[in-house]
């Protein structure tokens, strides 16, 4: 059996497959040349991350393909239903990156409440001439402890976010269409464990009660957070999106940031990737990262 890992694979993944007698090819094949390469080299398994797509046309044109694997959680770049209808197995690694994504959420949160996203831009420019002014500008930070975080989508990643939030002394509110209650277990360095039950609430209650909102939902056809939802949020609240682009109305978000309705936003995913809106990129109230939620050495090793 031949496996084409078109978007890369970790050495541990190569070793595991090779030890099982499987040939692993790590050549990066351009999307437009992928069909020919798969057919000419008798590829049975196509492994992708987020760069390579596996759409209907490719599936139809590659009758020898048996498995499509996605290293990561979201499978937006694969026509999953169609592939399965055609008899292919479609697999992913849903738990491998949960901790990494959750930690990135808090990287944005910690940076947001202390204005690091803006001070990191201005200190290199004006730190030597306007130090006291900048110190004054960023002197009204706040703590996360005692604040309420609302988690929209309470699957694996949402629950990892809850663990960190509870460790920070935050109140956790969650909303999920498919989960009523969830047990969150905190594991400590000395082997102790503490388990807490979190009951989910309707999304409107979460929106109205949260100081910070973070989204952990799959791709949606409509905004989860649009102008109407933002209007219901607390004044000065903040929002983080490390889920999928298109779950937040970015136009409404920027308007809310500019008006002062929201204090800051942290975005790892965008409506238009890989060319996010300039207004989003240039906002001095947005903490930015280029869709790197799963991009840690540990997560990539678990993904394979």
Q: How would you label these PLM feature ranges?
A:
Residues 65, 145-148, 227, 236:
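Phosphate-coordination loops involved in phosphoryl transfer and adenosine-cofactor binding
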Residues 154-155:
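Glycine-rich Rossmann-fold phosphate-binding loop(s) that bind the pyrophosphate
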Residues 275-277, 282-304:
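Adenosine-phosphate binding glycine-rich loop
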Residues 39, 54-58, 177-279:
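Rossmann-like adenosine-cofactor binding region
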Residues 86, 94-148:
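Phosphate-binding beta-alpha-beta segment of Rossmann-like dinucleotide-binding domains, i.e.
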Residues 44-45, 67, 212, 238, ...:
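Short, Asp-centered acidic motifs that coordinate Mg2+ and/or phosphate
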Residues 158-159:
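N-terminal Rossmann-fold NAD(P) dinucleotide-binding loop
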